[in-house]
């Protein structure tokens, strides 16, 4: 299975659904506030009613106001579904994070991002990144931090997919090749290995 293609197809479906939801909720407080703020940002060159009608009748305008699928944990949910894994909590007493000593901690301040899954004997972080740039490099740094700190005392994995990781996954594997506590893979690799 090519997980990148699967995610992109599901994101398209989510965009269509998100536009439908936006249009159904056009008169809700949240949508009205978005419209009002947009009109105010453009200092009255359009009215709230014009924007409202645009959302209802113009796909391009609606697409600018609907929720963005990348902010809805779609890839994480799809990875869980495809791999048959249960998502770990991102906060609270069952959250898994690592401090500078490689110890499991529950608080976010000064510690790694939380583990997303348990993959066999590994605490795993999962990322899907489809573009290049600064925000994506921040995600890469989060993954490296998770692997470095977590591997001090535990087995940790990075499940990384998308165009960005197609480029950086081999570099990451090279960086951690001598660390027996680190696994770097992708949903695509895992599903292909299951078939064999």
Which residues are covered by each model-predicted region?
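Conserved catalytic cores of phosphodiester-cleaving nucleases, focusing on short active-site segments
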Residues: 117-130
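Charged, structured surface patches that assemble and position nucleic-acid processing machinery
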Residues: 171-196
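Extracellular-facing segments of soluble proteins and assemblies that are Gly/Ser/Thr-biased and enriched
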Residues: 62-101
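Active-site metal-binding core of divalent-cation-utilizing nuclease and nuclease-like domains
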Residues: 89-119
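Catalytic cores of nucleic-acid endonucleases
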Residues: 128-175
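Nuclease-adjacent, charged terminal/linker segments that flank catalytic cores
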Residues: 1-74
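A short mid-domain helix/strand-loop element embedded in enzyme catalytic domains
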Residues: 48-58, 89-96, 120-123
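Short, well-structured alpha-helical interface segments that form or flank functional binding sites
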Residues: 70, 74, 78, 112, ...
């Amino acid at each position: 299975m090519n997980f990148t293609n699967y995610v992109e197809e599901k994101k398209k479906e989510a965009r269509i659904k998100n536009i439908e939801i936006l249009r159904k909720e056009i008169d809700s407080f949240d949508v009205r506030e978005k419209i009002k703020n947009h009109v105010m940002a453009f200092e009255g060159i359009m009215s709230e009613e014009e924007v409202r009608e645009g959302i209802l009748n113009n796909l391009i305008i609606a697409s600018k106001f609907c929720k963005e699928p990348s902010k809805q944990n779609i890839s994480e949910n799809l990875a869980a579904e495809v791999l048959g894994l249960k998502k770990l909590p991102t906060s609270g007493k069952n959250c898994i994070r690592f401090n500078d000593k490689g110890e499991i901690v529950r608080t976010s301040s000064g510690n790694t991002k939380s583990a997303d899954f348990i993959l066999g004997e590994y605490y795993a972080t999962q990322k899907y990144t489809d573009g290049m740039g600064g925000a994506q490099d921040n995600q890469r740094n989060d993954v490296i931090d998770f692997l470095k700190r977590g591997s001090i005392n535990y087995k940790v994995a990075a499940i990384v997919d998308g165009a960005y990781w197609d480029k950086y996954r081999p570099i990451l594997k090279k960086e951690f090749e001598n660390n027996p506590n680190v696994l770097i893979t992708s949903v695509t690799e895992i599903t292909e290995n299951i078939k064999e």
